[in-house]
């Protein structure tokens, strides 16, 4: 057998006829397979031993040579070589075709490759290949044109007219001749000139033709090789034929397909010898073409070839394609030996690094090891006897098994493996029974529970694999979540409840208020039953008495030494914070020790507490009735407003929903308050929810409050709430609505899980070759990071954003001038605290987005590896980790809907504006008008405010030590008070002395306001925290008059642009502007002053409700028309996941906004073809046209000044526009913020760098906009590094470099355009990828992980990297000894 040497790259090309003959060991001439009597292969048939090798080991066909000593001899009687039968897996044959045929991949797939080369349509090409039309090859001196198609009649007429002076023919021969006659160089230069002439308007077809021609030129393939004269026959063992029990045969479909080809080929050869009539020969040639098509790709044909049971036969292409194809089924997903699976049960007695392995299972898994030890110990002398002993399960076997599994790690895996923590290594401990025992704390990483989950066990065999399992995969080495660095091994459920109970405080119990000298005395008192666990006591700690509880003393006593005293009630979050803290301060070994102690304590005290739930624990607030009655009154008022026509139907619906959401929230707060007070906080239901052990506020609300609003199948909220709770019981209608919601939850879960899985698969595919390859790429670019706030609320602190990254710039202390952080220094937790102390709120850090490493990323730009809390190692597969970090929560979140049972969750909008902090209003921006009691914003506006952190009356100050407007940081002396004490600053901010007050304030911040907001404060006012400063309508956007005058309608015509609807419920007439767009009509409202001049004009969008009449007088601040907000939808990741999908696929949103391309002045123009033309006049007086659909609500008015990137109308932002108008960095920030927003709303924390890795891959390519002297084609999309490389070469030779613009490509498209053709082919569209790769003669450098898995190499990451392979261990002996 041929041995494949270790290789570094793979090339794919089109096989030439000579190459196919070269591969072959002989021609297959007959379609027979096996002789039915002898069951031996037929000579010259599809299984012929002379061609493909012997079926019996070291024996020829006739039996003349029978032994390994004749190896390599070819028998003189039967011509069969004496060799191993395994050669039948690798020897190929061939079929000499009687007529050329085209390869289906190159002519049938869109775009047809042969069609592009010859510039003929796919249908014309088909008609030539299937012998329906002639094509003119050489017109000679006739009127015919080259490549002209002629049907039978036209051909006969031309022959009669011109005789033999022209050459025309049909079938694959004709196409072959045309392809042979092509001059690729000449064609290429001709097309390039055409491309330059076309300039801006890139012709896609031209670009495709040029790319194919260039590919043929570079690869050395000849176009005529796409037409086949010789057909390869794959080795027989790959298309086997096996005998079944009943004497019948099962055979691979390929044999049938080959048989058809051979039969038709032989028949055609015979017909040609007999000089049969042309029409018969032609028909046979067409049939031969069809049979070869079926062999290569049966599913792509219109009429598929079916087998005996009328199912389509599986062709060569089908064997590669899809989930069941060769790539995904056999190369990327293999079944492995030395593995087993069983149900899991909890193992509370295990240590964190252990798992319980059933003895029977272990014996089977480690059988070969046991056999070897049995033979070594001379208990038996051969394998057969050893097997017998094992089957009898004698004592020696168990003793040896104990020795074998000692320190031999095993891997446990639970499907679905969504992230790398889905496979971890453990030390096996033998257990009775048949279930695998799992440590309770690793359940979270596996997402396992014990309701019948199964897990698979794998045994690492080689010492290297075992070493990796111990060092890298052991559960104790995987304490942190790679997605965000938070602990992933933490207690939950019973353990949390036990510790919560242990550390709670209770009034009036035995031993309350006693003092103890040390911990031992406390434990003694408890054991003597003279002290209650929850009693409040005083204990001497570090020389002073501390108030604590007996339970907390027990908890702290059990913790490893060196951890400071924990003096609080422990909930699940508190425990996670504690674990994080201990990990940072003391390292992983202390954490591991602590976790096992916590587990022990939690289970013990949960058992001692022995909590139960009864109906009396579910307390329904007495105030419930009052709340519900109040809500009903509010709703009656809303209905009344609706009846009067004050509000629209949509506003009524939104208001009703809002009232119920608010009522439910208030009732829940009241209920939780009552539960908290019940039994001094020892109400079991409250304890379970508050500790985070089980259940949530939302679930208790349904038990004791009210179920609340439910969602319809469509996601809309049903405005009738379920007022009952489960304790009171539901009415029939309430029960029915409930089932509706519950069913939606389950259906969503099933559908969305598949979506999230597919998202992960696409992300893995795009990022799988991103590996940390170098230490430092030397870039000087970085990204700005700052605290993410929503108004005043901090969503993500600077610490979360920047910790573990490297700084780009040097940062000095603004006061002392000393360097706090150097350039290229890692930003540690300590550094961040220092920076926050001196008031640094923004940083420029190195990021994967700006990394300039040629392949993958560098160590410095990536920063910290969160799973280890250390700088990332070279060789880390950061791309896959990124994909898993984003995909895994996607899958988790989709499963979250069904626990709440479809209860609607939507933020209830408030109509009042108040801020959490006290502040001073510095200024206002945006269009506003003065009304009698305040300021009314007629469009969106902004408040400029400064938050007040600290205030003191100046009369209480003796001496001020700082200046007005001076920046202060924590610890700086501010003033000396009247008592003579020096007061230090506890804040970072600016001093503001105003009137008789001393303030410390923040930098100026902006607060956005909606149109129609009424502000009740003035500029310069000091406003206390929580005070209402303005009101607005959350459910409608008004169009407000900015001047006084008379209303004049323009193009508002009843029946065309205006629709009058009589509301059936209220009997009122509602006037609504229609969605219909008319070229000549542009519905507007003018305001005319007393002199008859038009002083204002308002464009009315579709669906606006008119609030005024023609000719009516109007005052400043009156509402002209209203736009209703769409009805509330429930928010959960079911809405979020499709959004993430759209962002990663860079889809253009449906309801699209138009962004200003430049900064300048807005000019309204006419409506053309249903779109409104808006010009923006830039500073140079150049007009830039923007077209906006006519019915859209405009956010600008005639004459407004806008900045580039401002939204001109409402709608969603198109990421491609952001790239074009604001550039690459803005786009990266936009995508990052949008994706993070979806996850953050779900409470999922993913570090920016993971999303950054994916965005980097999406922006890998650039589009050529000027060719220069390079070989690029105008409009071509190329890799950034290829582009820079080519330009470098051209500049070196003194030529003109190419110019390119950045582009954004979605993840699916990027995966298909990836450099590695093996990776792309195993993702999607396998045959298309392979077709293009073969034409281009692509070389796969085997850089990524996927391609190496496919070809069976070690993956080039971690210990598989070349860097680590060269390490040698040497012994260094000191020569002096």
UniProtKB/Swiss-Prot annotation:
Keywords linked to the UniProt accession: DNA-directed RNA polymerase, Magnesium, Metal-binding, Nucleotidyltransferase, Transcription, Transferase, Zinc
Class in the EC hierarchy, top level: transferase
Essential cofactor(s): Mg(2+); Zn(2+)
Enzyme Commission number(s): 2.7.7.6
Binding site for Zn(2+) 2: 777, 851, 858, 861
Co-factor binding details: Binds 1 Mg(2+) ion per subunit. Binds 2 Zn(2+) ions per subunit.
Residues annotated as binding Zn(2+) 1: 60, 62, 75, 78
Catalytic activity: RNA(n) + a ribonucleoside 5'-triphosphate = RNA(n+1) + diphosphate
Residue positions binding Mg(2+): 449, 451, 453
GO MF annotation terms: DNA binding; DNA-directed RNA polymerase activity; magnesium ion binding; zinc ion binding
Coiled coil start-end: none
GO cellular component: DNA-directed RNA polymerase complex
Subunit description: The RNAP catalytic core consists of 2 alpha, 1 beta, 1 beta' and 1 omega subunit. When a sigma factor is associated with the core the holoenzyme is formed, which can initiate transcription.
Protein name: DNA-directed RNA polymerase subunit beta'
Organism: Borreliella burgdorferi (strain ZS7) (Borrelia burgdorferi)
Gene: rpoC
């Amino acid at each position: 057998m041929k041995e494949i040497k270790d290789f570094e790259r793979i090339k794919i090309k089109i096989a030439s006829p000579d190459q196919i003959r070269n591969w072959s060991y002989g021609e297959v001439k007959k379609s027979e397979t096996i002789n039915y009597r002898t069951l031996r292969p037929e000579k010259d048939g599809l299984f012929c031993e002379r061609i493909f090798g012997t079926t019996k080991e070291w024996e020829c066909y006739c039996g003349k040579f029978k032994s390994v000593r004749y190896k390599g001899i070819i028998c003189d009687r039967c011509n069969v070589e004496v060799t191993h039968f395994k050669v039948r897996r690798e020897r190929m044959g061939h079929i000499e075709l009687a007529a050329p045929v085209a390869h289906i991949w190159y002519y049938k797939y869109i775009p047809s490759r042969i069609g592009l080369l010859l510039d003929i349509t796919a249908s014309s090409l088909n008609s030539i290949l299937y012998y329906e039309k002639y094509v003119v090859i050489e017109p000679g001196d006739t009127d015919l044109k080259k490549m002209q198609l002629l049907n039978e009649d036209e051909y006969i007429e031309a022959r009669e007219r011109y005789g033999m002076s022209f050459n025309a023919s049909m079938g694959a021969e004709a196409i072959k001749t045309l392809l042979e006659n092509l001059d690729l160089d000449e064609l290429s230069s001709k097309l390039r000139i055409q491309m330059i002439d076309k300039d801006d308007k890139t012709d896609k077809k031209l670009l495709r033709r040029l790319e194919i021609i260039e590919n043929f030129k570079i690869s050395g393939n000849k176009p005529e090789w796409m037409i086949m004269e010789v057909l390869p026959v794959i080795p027989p063992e790959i298309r086997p034929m096996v005998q079944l029990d009943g004497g019948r045969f099962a055979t691979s479909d390929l044999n049938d397909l080959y048989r058809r080809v051979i039969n038709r080929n032989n028949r055609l050869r015979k017909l040609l010898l007999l000089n049969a009539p042309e029409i018969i020969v032609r028909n046979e040639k067409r049939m031969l073409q069809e049979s070869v098509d079926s062999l290569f790709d049966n599913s792509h044909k219109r009429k598929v070839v079916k087998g005996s049971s009328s199912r389509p036969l599986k062709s060569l292409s089908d064997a590669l394609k899809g989930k069941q194809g060769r790539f995904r089924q056999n190369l990327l997903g293999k079944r492995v030996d030395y593995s087993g699976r069983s149900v899991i049960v909890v193992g509370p007695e295990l240590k964190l690094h252990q798992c319980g392995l059933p003895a029977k299972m272990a014996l089977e898994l480690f059988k070969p090891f046991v056999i070897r030890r049995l033979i070594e110990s001379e208990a038996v002398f051969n394998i057969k006897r050893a097997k017998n002993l094992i089957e009898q399960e004698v004592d020696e076997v168990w003793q040896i098994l104990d020795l074998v599994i000692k320190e031999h790690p095993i891997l446990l895996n639970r499907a679905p493996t969504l992230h790398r923590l889905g496979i971890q290594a453990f030390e096996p401990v033998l257990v009775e029974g048949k279930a695998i025992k799992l440590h309770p704390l690793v359940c979270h990483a596996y997402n396992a529970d014990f309701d019948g989950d199964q897990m698979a066990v794998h045994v690492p065999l080689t010492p290297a694999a075992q070493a990796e399992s111990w060092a890298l995969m052991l559960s104790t080495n995987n304490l942190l979540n790679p997605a965000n660095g938070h602990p992933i091994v933490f207690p939950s459920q019973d353990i949390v409840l036990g510790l919560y109970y242990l550390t709670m405080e209770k009034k009036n119990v035995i031993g309350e208020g006693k003092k103890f000298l040390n911990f031992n005395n406390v434990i003694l008192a408890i054991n003597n039953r003279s002290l209650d666990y929850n009693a409040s006591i005083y204990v001497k700690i570090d020389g002073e008495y501390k108030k604590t509880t007996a339970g907390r003393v027990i908890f702290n006593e059990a913790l490893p030494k060196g951890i400071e005293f924990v003096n609080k009630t422990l909930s699940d979050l508190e425990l996670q914070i504690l674990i994080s803290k201990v990990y940072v301060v003391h390292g992983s070994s202390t954490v591991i020790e602590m976790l096992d102690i916590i587990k022990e304590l939690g289970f013990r005290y949960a058992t001692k507490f022995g909590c139960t739930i009864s109906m009396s624990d579910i307390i329904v607030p007495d105030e419930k009735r009052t709340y519900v009655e109040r809500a009903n009154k509010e709703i009656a008022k809303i209905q009344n407003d609706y009846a009067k026509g004050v509000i629209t139907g949509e506003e009524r619906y939104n208001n009703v929903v809002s009232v119920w959401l608010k009522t439910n929230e208030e009732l829940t707060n009241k209920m939780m308050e009552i539960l908290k007070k019940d039994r001094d906080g020892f109400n079991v239901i409250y304890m379970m929810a508050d500790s985070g052990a089980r259940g949530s506020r939302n679930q208790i609300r349904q038990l004791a409050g009210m179920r609340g609003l439910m969602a319809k199948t469509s996601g809309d909220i049903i405005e009738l709430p379920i007022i009952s709770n489960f304790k009171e019981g539901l009415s029939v209608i309430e029960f029915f609505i409930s089932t509706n919601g519950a069913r939606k939850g389950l259906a969503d879960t099933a559908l969305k899980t598949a979506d999230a899985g597919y998202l992960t698969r696409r992300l893995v595919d795009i990022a799988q070759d991103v590996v940390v390859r170098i230490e430092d790429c030397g870039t000087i670019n970085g990204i700005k990071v700052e605290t993410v706030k929503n108004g005043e609320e901090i969503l993500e602190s600077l610490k979360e954003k920047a910790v573990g990254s490297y700084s780009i710039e040097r940062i000095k202390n603004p006061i002392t001038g000393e360097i706090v952080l150097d350039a290229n220094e890692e930003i540690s937790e300590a550094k961040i605290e220092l920076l926050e102390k001196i008031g640094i709120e923004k940083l420029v850090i190195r990021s994967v987005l700006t990394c300039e490493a040629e392949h993958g990323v560098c160590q410095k730009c990536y920063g910290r590896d969160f799973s280890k809390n250390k700088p990332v190692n070279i060789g880390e597969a950061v791309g896959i980790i990124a994909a898993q970090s984003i995909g895994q929560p996607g899958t988790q979140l989709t499963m979250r809907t069904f626990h709440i049972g479809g209860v609607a969750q939507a933020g209830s909008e408030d109509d009042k504006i108040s801020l959490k902090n006290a502040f001073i209003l510095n200024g206002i921006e945006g269009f506003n008008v003065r009304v009698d009691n305040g300021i009314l914003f007629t469009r969106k506006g902004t408040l400029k405010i400064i938050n007040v952190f600290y205030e003191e009356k100046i009369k209480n100050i003796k001496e001020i030590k700082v200046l007005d407007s001076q920046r202060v940081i924590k610890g700086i002396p501010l003033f000396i008070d009247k008592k003579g004490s020096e007061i230090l600053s506890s804040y970072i901010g600016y001093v503001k002395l105003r009137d008789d007050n001393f303030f410390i304030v923040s930098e100026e911040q902006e607060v956005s306001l909606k149109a129609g907001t009424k502000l009740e404060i003035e500029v310069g006012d000091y406003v206390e925290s929580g005070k209402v400063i303005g009101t607005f309508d959350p459910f409608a956007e008004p169009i407000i008059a900015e001047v006084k005058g008379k209303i004049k309608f323009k193009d508002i015509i009843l029946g065309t642009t205006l629709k009058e609807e009589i509301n059936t419920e209220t009997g009122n007439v509602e006037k609504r502007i229609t969605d219909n767009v008319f070229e000549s009509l542009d519905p507007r409202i003018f305001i005319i002053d007393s002199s008859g001049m038009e002083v204002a004009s308002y464009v009315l969008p579709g669906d606006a409700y008119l609030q005024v009449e023609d000719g009516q007088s109007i005052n400043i601040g009156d509402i002209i028309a209203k736009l209703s907000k769409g009805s509330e939808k429930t928010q959960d990741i079911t809405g979020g996941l499709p959004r993430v999908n759209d962002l990663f696929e860079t889809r253009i949103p449906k309801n699209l906004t138009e962004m200003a391309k430049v900064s300048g002045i807005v000019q309204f123009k006419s409506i053309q073809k249903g779109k409104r033309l808006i010009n923006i006049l830039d500073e140079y007086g150049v007009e830039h046209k923007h077209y906006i659909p006519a019915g859209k609500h405009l956010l600008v008015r005639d004459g407004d000044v806008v900045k580039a990137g401002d939204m001109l109308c409402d709608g969603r932002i198109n990421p491609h526009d952001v790239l074009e108008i604001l550039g690459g960095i803005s786009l990266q920030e936009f995508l990052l913020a949008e994706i993070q927003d979806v996850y953050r709303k779900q409470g999922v924390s993913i570090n920016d760098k993971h999303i950054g890795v994916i965005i980097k891959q999406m922006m890998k390519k650039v589009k050529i906009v000027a060719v220069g002297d390079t070989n690029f084609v105008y409009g071509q999309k190329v890799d950034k590094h290829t582009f820079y490389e080519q330009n470098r070469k051209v500049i070196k030779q003194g030529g003109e470099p190419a110019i390119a613009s950045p582009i954004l490509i979605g993840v699916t498209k990027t995966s298909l355009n990836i450099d590695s053709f093996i990776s792309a082919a195993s993702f999607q569209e396998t045959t298309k990828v392979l077709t293009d790769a073969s034409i281009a003669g692509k070389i796969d450098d085997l850089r990524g992980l996927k391609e190496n898995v496919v070809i069976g190499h070690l993956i080039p990451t971690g210990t598989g990297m070349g860097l680590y392979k060269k390490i040698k261990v040497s012994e260094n002996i000191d020569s002096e000894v």
